Amino acid sequence: TTYRSDVYNPDSRKPEVQYGDTLEGDLSRRDFTVNAMALRVPDMEFVDPFAGANDLAKGVLRTPVDPRQSFDDDPLRMMRAVRFVAQLGFTIEARTAEAISDMSSRLNIVSAERIRDELQKMLLSERPRKGVEALVDSGLAQYVLPEIPALRLEIDEHHRHKDVFEHTMMVLERAIALETDENGAVPAPDLTLRLAAL
């Protein structure tokens, strides 16, 4: 097997592909520890240098290397973290969450198409509200859906106990409820409906 150890230019997401010589080095360049495990064949040796199995069992997202280096290499990984919160119900480990907040502006070098793909996957997941909340809390939303964080500043004149953001999240949840009936899902998550709710 050929192992990779890419080198990134800080102003671009496109790596200069280089080949490494160890499986551990290859795994260190993965997005999160839960994706940095391997099975060495034919011996069937489980390789988990970053305790990804433990993080998977706990539902925790952490980067195999320093999160700042990981997100500097590929800023889309920050969006992927938010998607995993929504899709898998994971939580983001504190150091990783702090790096996302500090580096959210790095999304500017990622193509709109790649961001769109992650956003759509997040919105079509089982817990899009959790994903939207993670987008807002991390600061990523200001680069992806800038209208959404501003809703926290607005108070609904009729329901003063909740801000417009909370009402919007309730509308999103109601829209999702419309996707099901007594027979189950009808027929699948509806991206247009969920976007309209936002």
Name each region found by the language model.
Residues 1-198:
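Catalytic cores of the polymerase beta-like nucleotidyltransferase superfamily
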